[in-house]
């Protein structure tokens, strides 16, 4: 074992005493750990401050990142293709004397482009009559918005027509928004059903009132289906007459005045005449009430054809619900 240690010492070149004295070229160890590296000096990473300063200076001179270095656009002049939105300046008078505010605002560099645009088309001594011609020549308004040629005229025409139509609607006392949206008169069959429900009149073959959890069914059947079902009740006879009238004289129904009465279909109404009279006449539908309206294909097509497509899905915009 001692021979092995001596051989190792010889291979390393000298004894430990010579190493401690520093006679060899290798520096002494900083720690007692034999695997530790030999440190000549502390090599810390130095951040290249000079290189970064040079890069920032070059970027500022190039003007690519002006929005980063100048966040408030008051220290830099924007390029000509960038639109500048500012308050409209008062026009210079015929004598050439401008307001004090105009002279103060002309100091800002961001508003020079708009002044040049105004000065290209209008002389500095323009009067109030020349301002209309100036507005027609320029494609944008004084506040910076883009003009559309026939936009305001279309708005004024539509507003005048809508105001006249709203006046006519207000003269006829309309109590519900759904009736205001409907442009066709109320169908006869619906009038018959709602009037019979409001009076509490029930057909002779009256079914028992629905249970607590059931949904009441209001049947609006056409003439063909009512004839095929057997003996017609007064309500079905009225429905058949209304459908026949709608078939033959559909053009005359358009000339009738618009009926603007409120339609209430209450789920709490009972089929008995005694209870039906006091079943909340004129009572609106609550959120917990449900009404199922059963219609034939002909009636459905008629209602869908005469109902204007208001906002939403047209098949679900029932005008009476």
Swiss-Prot record:
Residues 50-59, 179-189 have a biased composition (Basic and acidic residues). Residues 99-115 have a biased composition (Acidic residues). It comes from the Viruses. Coiled coil: none annotated. It comes from Equine herpesvirus 2 (strain 86/87). This is Uncharacterized gene 45 protein. Residues 156-175, 231-242 have a biased composition (Low complexity). Residues 1-12 have a biased composition (Basic residues). Residues 1-59, 71-289 are annotated as: Disordered.
